[in-house]
């Protein structure tokens, strides 16, 4: 579980399924994370520049974009390349996600266990790659 601290970490969650987005948001807020949720990618870059997240949780299959292309966009921009990204997907598995040269910091297949999500987030925020 995430440790309580006085330094709140900002997490941007981009997930098109409203129920999943709401659950992730509530769980992370209960663990003292500051969470911004988007259900499409259109506002991603402006939101990143505004909120400066410590982590982006990014669904691969969005109605308006492919999360892998968004990852490539983030990694290609010097102002966002340093931001850790956790990819999530119901369709893909860790073995069949094509990362190419732009690798995420982690991947979780949906449905995922809440403790696995929190452990993965905590690990990524402490510098680990999965």
Predicted features along the sequence, with ranges:
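Two-component/phosphorelay signaling modules centered on CheY-like receiver
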Residues: 18-36
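The feature encodes the CheY-like receiver
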Residues: 63, 81
């Amino acid at each position: 579980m995430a440790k309580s601290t006085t330094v709140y970490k900002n997490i941007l969650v981009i997930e098109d399924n409203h129920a999943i987005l709401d659950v992730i948001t509530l769980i992370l807020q209960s663990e003292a994370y500051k969470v911004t949720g988007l259900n499409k990618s259109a506002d991603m870059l402006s939101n990143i520049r505004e909120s400066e997240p410590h982590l982006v949780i990014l669904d691969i299959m969005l109605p308006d974009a492919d999360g892998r292309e968004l990852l490539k966009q983030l990694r290609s921009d010097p102002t966002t390349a340093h931001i850790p990204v956790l990819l999530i997907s119901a369709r893909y598995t860790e073995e069949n996600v094509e990362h190419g040269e732009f690798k995420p910091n982690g991947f979780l297949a949906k449905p995922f266990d809440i403790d696995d999500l929190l452990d993965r987030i905590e690990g990524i925020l402490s510098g680990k790659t999965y």
